């Protein structure tokens, strides 16, 4: 990692320094490090950027020295949400590093796609076309390339997108609004058609997500049920994204399919971990906390780590805390939400 990311900076805001120290300290409880990360993410994502933006980005990037694949993948996600070109170099370094965990590299590629800068295209295309790379890396780079091309296209300017309840920058935008809106069954058909480009299928996924929020929307349960079918897709990347979307939605109708995914010991760790964290966001639903506790000693490290974070999130949901974050005494309270 570049020295600017790991060296102790001088003249940096005390709050950022405090959060950074917690984030990079391997002796700190993982849940506390996650809360520090989400506090830094809030600062790094402020628009317009402030004098704290770059130090917050550098503080997040400093965490890539961690031994936790779960934490590193979340760092990459947070950097991808900043809309800031200063995050690009850190993500490029991670995605090119074949010694990094595949889950972390995938999230770095996705983050580059979310940032949308065409300077990342050459690296992403090379990884997409490299037959020696793992499927999850190639597929993520494929979607990221398509998203960057879309972001910088004339087509994007002419598309009318349905306003979303979610502020996240997604791997793909929802399908554009048309004179006659596609039915949930039409979107489900696109979602599950493995012959279509992943980018197009992701667009259907996020269109379905937006039809499931708020939870009392008449289309919500049907949209959740359609999305749940994606958890049987042959692509692990695709399955993990469905679980992530369920974590955003926090809809009780997703609990059975998420529980089934987490319980499947043959499922890939990156999918099970996402199911665990999604269940954590549903911590106020009866039985969810007990389900999570069953996997505290799971054989897979990333799943065990996710359970720790998920139980912390579940506690936050039950207690109705204002923000899932670690706000030092010197910082003014800010509404910070988990990714």
UniProtKB/Swiss-Prot annotation:
One Gene Ontology term, aspect cellular component: nucleus
Family: Belongs to the deoxyhypusine hydroxylase family.
Binding site for Fe cation 2: 240-241, 273-274
Cofactor(s) this protein cannot do without: Fe(2+)
Taxonomy of the source species: Eukaryota, Fungi, Dikarya, Ascomycota, Pezizomycotina
Region feature Disordered, mapped onto this chain: 159-183
Protein task: Catalyzes the hydroxylation of the N(6)-(4-aminobutyl)-L-lysine intermediate to form hypusine, an essential post-translational modification only found in mature eIF-5A factor.
Matching Gene3D superfamilies: Leucine-rich Repeat Variant
Binding site for Fe cation 1: 73-74, 106-107
Locations listed in the record: Cytoplasm; Nucleus
Keyword Nucleus: yes
HEAT-like PBS-type repeat windows: 71-97, 104-130, 200-233, 238-264, 271-298
Keywords on record: Cytoplasm, Hypusine biosynthesis, Iron, Metal-binding, Monooxygenase, Nucleus, Oxidoreductase, Repeat
GO MF entries: deoxyhypusine monooxygenase activity; metal ion binding
Chain segments annotated as coiled-coil in the UniProt record: none
Free-text comment on the cofactor: Binds 2 Fe(2+) ions per subunit.
Pathways per UniProt: Protein modification; eIF5A hypusination
Superkingdom in the source lineage: Eukaryota
EC number: 1.14.99.29
Pfam families linked to this entry: HEAT_2
Substrates-to-products reaction catalysed: [eIF5A protein]-deoxyhypusine + AH2 + O2 = [eIF5A protein]-hypusine + A + H2O
Protein name per Swiss-Prot or TrEMBL: Deoxyhypusine hydroxylase
